[in-house]
A protein has these predicted regions:
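Domain-level recognition of nuclease-like catalytic cores that cleave nucleotide substrates
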Residues: 464-510
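N-terminal pre-P-loop "Q-motif" helix
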Residues: 12-24
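Accessory nucleic acid-recognition modules appended to NTPase machines
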Residues: 228-230, 237-415
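Conserved catalytic cores of phosphodiester-cleaving nucleases, focusing on short active-site segments
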Residues: 384, 413-423, 428-441, 451, ...
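Conserved small helical "lid"/interfacial subdomain of P-loop NTPases
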Residues: 186-211
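Sensor-1/coupling segment of RecA-like P-loop NTPase cores
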Residues: 37-41, 133-137, 141-178
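Conserved NTP-binding/hydrolysis module of P-loop NTPases
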Residues: 57-61, 67, 71-90, 104, ...
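Mid-core helix/loop region of P-loop NTP-binding domains shared across ATPases and GTPases
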Residues: 88-127, 133-137, 144, 148-158
Length: 510
């Protein structure tokens, strides 16, 4: 296969530079054998948009499956393939076996006709979108593809096959331990939501206070701005309340039922009521397995399956406690689902009858405690993982959160943002940063003292804290007394302006 120049990303594709580079490197790699890539990501992330742009730039065959019977799906695939190769008559494959064999045959070395205008040595890009729909009606497909991939690891081939889908449990299962395609993929790409900074730019919001609230509700899902809301963007922080009522909380808006659809679309979710109860428990602040079980009135062992399914679907994430082995907390990954469970579901009947303004007026406390607050913590961890990393004494270490127990005071100190480097060999585990996050509280010296106490306790347990900085993250600001403490050389203050790159943090870590 001849080496292809890397095609540039179209200007209409916002952000996604790393994803584009990964895809084009996969397509243009000069390997004379078949290559397989798996592209997944929850719905509305722009996967199809990205892959269509790739096919436009690189040439190739794009097919998007739909929900249907096996016969109908095979007929649609056959017709699309016939059109692609310019056949005057439609193909009528009797089985998927025949269709897959023919498809790979098009990419055999020196074969012409795979792509209009392509040279015999050019890679043949094939994108099969919504692949889980096909697997549902033709479960033998992964095995058929495995057979052809294995064959064309020996024989020469120009095939660059990308299988794409949104049912995360199905897509994740394609490469699982005993799956036919295990070990066959040269690319495994998960298209994730935009980070909070990219999302603010995408929504054209320049006010950090508005951007943070907006991200706490709709997250970084690209489709929500244009496809769902037709560019209805809150004009200012003052407009945010009205915007919430006319969009997410309006029964006439597509976003109103979106959280329910996101759950219903996952292939492995049957009893949606149970899954909504699990998500509601987490949204209410019951983030441990025992807490979730207690909230919904089940035993811990009885909720293992729904927790696993929600994790496999990328709707729930288990975050390990960086200070206590074996301890973990669950977090809802999709902000809109968290907002639905915390604010909308408890008042669903009233919202359906058009009482958005009244419901939202009574939800301010819940929004701050259950939506904006926890989301702000995740944003602060994202900041430390990315743009804020240069402020630390080390570029290494795991970013997370955890609890430090203070036996003397009989209390637990919650650390919202921590950077911990595990020990290896002769080196002790070290802590580079301990941080506390507050959404609606002006932070003062007391918060800093609590972090300092946690640092002492960790040092007493044998962790290296000699270069451990203390950070206070607040969306509401800091007292003058706390600002004065930044002269010490081990304190950082990070507000919304700093989080969004509008200003540098106050203080320095020496």
């Amino acid at each position: 296969v001849q080496h292809q120049a890397m095609p540039g990303k179209p200007s209409r594709v916002y952000d996604r530079g790393a994803e584009w580079d990964g895809l084009t490197a996969f397509v243009s790699r000069p390997l004379p054998h078949a290559m397989l890539g798996i592209v997944s990501g929850r719905r509305r992330m722009g996967k199809t948009y990205l892959l269509r742009a790739l096919v436009e730039r690189c040439g190739g065959f794009y097919f998007s499956a739909t929900a249907g019977t096996e016969a109908e799906s095979l007929r649609q695939f056959s017709a699309a393939l016939a059109e692609h190769v310019g056949s005057p008559v439609a193909f009528s494959f009797a089985t998927w076996d025949d269709a897959v064999s023919y498809l790979f045959g098009l990419a055999a070395h020196g074969k012409r006709g795979a792509s209009a205008g392509s040279t015999p040595d050019a890679p043949f890009l094939v994108v099969i979108d919504e692949f889980p729909y096909l697997v549902k009606v033709a479960p033998e497909l992964p095995s058929l593809i495995q057979r052809e991939i294995d064959r064309f690891q020996v024989e020469e081939s120009r095939m660059r096959l990308l299988l794409c889908g949104s049912a995360m449990s199905v897509m994740g299962g394609l490469l699982a331990s005993t799956a036919p395609l295990r070990g066959r993929a040269q690319l495994e790409l998960v298209v994730r939501p935009f980070g909070y900074r990219a999302a603010a730019d995408f929504w054209s919001v320049t006010d950090p206070a508005l951007a943070a609230r907006l991200h706490a509700v709709v997250g970084g899902t690209p489709a929500y701005r244009r496809q769902f809301l037709a560019d209805d963007v809150p004009a200012s922080l003052r407009d945010f309340d009205d915007w919430i009522c006319r969009t997410v909380l309006s029964p006439f808006s597509p976003l109103f039922r979106e959280a329910r659809y996101l759950l219903a679309e996952e292939a492995d979710i049957r009893d949606t009521a149970l899954y909504h109860s699990v998500l509601a428990a987490v949204a209410q602040g019951n983030t441990t397995r025992g807490g979730i079980a207690g909230y919904i009135g089940r035993k811990s062992v009885d909720i293992s399956h729904p927790l696993n399914v929600l994790e496999d679907s990328h709707l729930l994430m288990r975050e390990l406690d960086v200070f206590r082995a074996g301890k973990s907390q669950y977090r809802i990954t999709e902000p809109l689902i968290n907002f639905y469970e915390a604010v909308m579901r408890p008042s669903w009947a009233r919202l359906e009858s058009g009482q958005a303004a009244e419901v939202w007026g009574q939800a301010a406390e819940r929004f701050a405690a259950q939506v904006a607050g926890p989301h702000f913590e995740a944003m602060c961890r994202e900041y430390v993982l990315g743009p804020g990393r240069s402020l630390l004494s080390t570029s290494l270490g795991e970013v997370g959160g955890g609890v430090v127990t203070d036996p003397k005071e009989r209390r637990q100190i919650q650390i919202d943002v921590a950077v911990v480097e595990p020990g290896s060999g002769a080196s002790r585990p070290s802590v580079a940063l301990l941080g506390e996050v507050k959404w609606g509280t002006v932070m003062g010296v007391g918060h800093l003292e609590r972090l300092g106490r946690a640092r002492e306790l960790l040092a007493g347990r044998g962790m290296d804290t000699t270069r451990c900085g203390l950070a206070c993250f607040s969306a509401a600001g800091f007292t003058d007394a706390l600002r004065a403490e930044t002269a010490r050389g081990d304190v950082l203050l990070v507000g919304l302006e700093e989080l969004y790159g509008r200003a540098m943090p106050t203080g320095v870590l020496l």
